[in-house]
Amino acid sequence: MILRSSLGRLGVARESPLCLQCLNRSRPSFPAVNKLASISRLQSTVAGQSPSSSVNKTYFSSHKGDSHLTPQPSLFTSLSPSNSPSQLNRGHSTPSTSPELSELPHRRRKRLKEAAAQNNGAEPVIPPDASAQLSNFSSTLPKTSLRRKLAAFFALTKPRLSFLVLLSTTSAYGIYPVSSILALDPTIAPLPTLSTSTLTFLYLTTGTFLSACSANTLNMIFEPKYDAQMSRTRNRPLVRGLVTRRAAVFFAIATAAVGLGLLYFGTNPTVTGLSAANIALYAFVYTPLKRMHVINTWIGAIVGGIPPMMGWVAAAGQGATTGHDTWRDMLFGENSLGGWLLGGILFAWQFPHFNALSHTIREEYKGAGYKMLCWTNPARNARVALRYSVLMFPLSIGLWWAGIVGHGFLVSSTVANGWLTKEAYGFWKHQGANGTARGLFWASIWQLPILLVGALVTKKGLWDGVWGGIFGQPIEDDDDDYVYYEEVSPGKTINQSPTSPSSPVV
């Protein structure tokens, strides 16, 4: 009975299309599967085929009646294509990743290096100047905002150029030797007619900055049509209409009047005359000459060389006595050599700086109609930059020879000028290609501050007291630099011979 019952139940099982064992085998997930099976499952998934669906489909389509008693190939045939060696080899030989991801690191570096070499001739993009950046900032503010108007007017001044003028002026003022001023005795000779306090320095800095603002504003007033044709200047305030032409003219006149007035009352008339000449030279000579002849670069270099003369004359005026404070005494006196040397350094510096800058945008200068060496004669443009870079050496040595700076300046100036000359030589050799124009431009940006700060640090007599305090060396006084007088009562005269040992030294 039990056997019959079992056989009966077996027959019933045979009539069933599925058994428990086959049902477990047909499940889509496998608890234990080898690595090859997992790879094949991944490949079939990428190809858009689901392993579970293929197993169920092939199994149920091939399972009929009591065929479960014999080995069914349907379950294994569904896995066999993905487990075949040929399919696995194809999966490893043709990965689904992109060529960039499968590229070896050294080949990628080589490819990027070759691409950079092909684009080496392309000129770097020059960023907008400070005026354009301020104009962009001003345009984002509400039209009735006070900050919008202030930013637009400040953009007229070319802030970076104005600060460069201020730096060269104050550096010359600080480099001027003050031993003659400190040695003045009010009981012997009257003090200078001009102020010797720090108020003079404040008048000088404020007046110089306002004068530079006026000159730069006038330059923009005359060139909005041409500024619109260049990428560096097309966002300036007058081009974009952030400031009216009438307001710009009023601003230029006001800054010139206030600046020159401060220089006249706070320094001396010679400084005021130099500043007025610089405004006229930059706005009314250099600006229109840019569209006429390449000599405009030399005129612009003269404009750059005047501010150091202003600082030197302002300092010299503090030690000038009444009757010896004329413009001839200031500009051509015995102590004026330092001012001319500093002015010469700024004059020479303009050429490597501007020639390198103009080379990178020479096509824009040409399109706007500006007569510049960078496109009219590129070879001469490079030669001029190298020539004036070499001129920096004798001008710097001249400051030491004149007794204005110490021996340390010879070292610092040689390093700075050597770097500039090296970049200028590469600029001349490659005619501005291979990144030499950009290298010379940045060398000029750093060379000038290094030179001026080096002159300030190594100023003659600045470290004498420190040197003597550290090494215990007394400061040697030169008796010839001082004048000794006898106290003479009123009405009494001295009738001693100049050669007499007891006569005062004059």
UniProtKB/Swiss-Prot annotation:
Residues 73-88 have a biased composition (Low complexity). It is a multi-pass membrane protein. One of its GO terms (biological process) is heme A biosynthetic process. Residues 45-61, 89-100 have a biased composition (Polar residues). GO terms for cellular component: mitochondrial membrane; mitochondrion. Keywords: Heme biosynthesis, Membrane, Mitochondrion, Transferase, Transit peptide, Transmembrane, Transmembrane helix. Belongs to the UbiA prenyltransferase family. This is Protoheme IX farnesyltransferase, mitochondrial. It comes from Emericella nidulans (strain FGSC A4 / ATCC 38163 / CBS 112.46 / NRRL 194 / M139). The gene is cox10.
